[in-house]
Amino acid sequence: NDLISKLAEVLKTEDIPAPSWSLFVKTGAHADKPPQKSDWWHTRCASILRKIYFHGPISVNELRTMYGDGKRNMYYGARHHKDASGAIIRNAMHGLEKLGYVEKVEKKGRVLSRQGMQKLDKMSTEILNEMIQKTPKLKIYS
């Protein structure tokens, strides 16, 4: 997704550092190994920001379910859902709150702040304009 990759690049330049433990952790009980990309933390933060934009207000628990996966027994049996790591999602949300892109709604979860909404809308418009340059038929969507 262009939006997530561009947003991840922007978040790298802003003050949202990856925790020191992010190099060693798996993303959940369903994962066999830690992520291979070194910038996975910023990509996950960008992805969380996008999910809050579409699904907010949303809780950490709901995001754990969305990012989780089915774990299959190696030899037999059905898939069983395993939630993603809550610490990763929680720390990413705290970083996004610090930047002012996300705010808490009591007993409901988190939503995008006005600043976060403007950031995503601006980036989406830039991406659409780039796509229109490549494919002029897309002009009907602007």
Region locations from a protein language model:
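Long, low-complexity, charged/polar intrinsically disordered regions in eukaryotic proteins
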Residues: N1-A46, R50
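Long, charge-rich, low-complexity intrinsically disordered regions
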Residues: I16-P19, S38, T65, Y76, ...
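Charge-enriched amphipathic alpha-helical scaffolds
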Residues: R44-S47, H81-H94
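Short amphipathic alpha-helical elements of helix-turn-helix/winged-helix folds
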Residues: S47-H55, M66
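Short acidic, hydrophobic short linear motifs in intrinsically disordered regions
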Residues: P57-H80
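Residue-level detection of the helix-turn-helix DNA-binding "recognition helix"
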Residues: G68, H94, D121, T125
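A short, conserved structural fragment
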Residues: H94-K107
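Short, amphipathic alpha-helical interaction segments positioned at domain boundaries
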Residues: K108, R114-S142
